[in-house]
Regions:
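Chalcogenol-based redox active-site neighborhoods
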Residues: 2-178
Length: 178
């Protein structure tokens, strides 16, 4: 009897969490949509807003946690590609639910030359359909959005592979220059 009760409770919790998570995916902006705005602190405590990137391409990548294996690889690949990305007229911002102190340590440890934005409550990740919300724990899904010079979503990369994400973005930007 207790086993069935526990199974029922567990099933209910799983369904509830699935429903909560499904809501954030419904917010996913598509190519051509205006990029959802944001006002977030970076690793240096400076407030960053979407509008400051008008006139350049913006690679906005969401990642689960600072200093975890996939996130380190993805960040280092963006770091190593900064010259090519800047030549293509692009800036890079990483966003996770970590605080700006964690971001500062992460950026310092790996010499990251771009902004890491602290989305502590996951609000911005939610507006980009990129939040995993399990109630007691939240983290960003590994999605990347390429925002054009006019502030519109140009390309969406979902569930990206950290080892390939940067190459896909660079290749896309090169096709625009050709």
């Amino acid at each position: 009897m207790i086993g069935w009760l526990l199974a029922g409770i567990l099933t209910g919790v799983v369904l509830l969490l699935w429903r909560i998570n499904a809501k954030t995916s419904a917010n996913l902006p598509k190519a051509g949509d205006p990029a959802p705005g944001f006002t977030l602190p970076d690793q240096n405590g400076n407030t960053r807003v979407l509008d400051e990137f008008q006139g350049k391409w913006l690679v906005l990548y969401f990642y689960p946690r600072d200093d975890t294996p996939g996130c380190v690889e993805q960040a280092m690949r963006f770091r190593n590609s900064m010259r090519d990305l800047e030549t293509a007229g692009a800036a890079v911002c990483g966003i996770s639910v970590d605080d700006n102190r964690s971001h500062a340590a992460f950026a310092r440890k790996y010499n990251l030359p771009f902004a890491l934005l602290a989305d502590r409550n996951g609000e911005v990740a939610g507006r980009y359909g990129s939040l995993r919300n399990f109630g007691f724990i939240k983290f960003a899904k590994r999605n990347t959005f390429l925002v054009d010079r006019q502030g519109r979503v140009a390309k969406v990369y979902l569930g990206v592979n950290p080892a390939r994400n940067t190459q896909y973005v660079s290749d896309y930007l090169k096709t625009l220059a050709a």
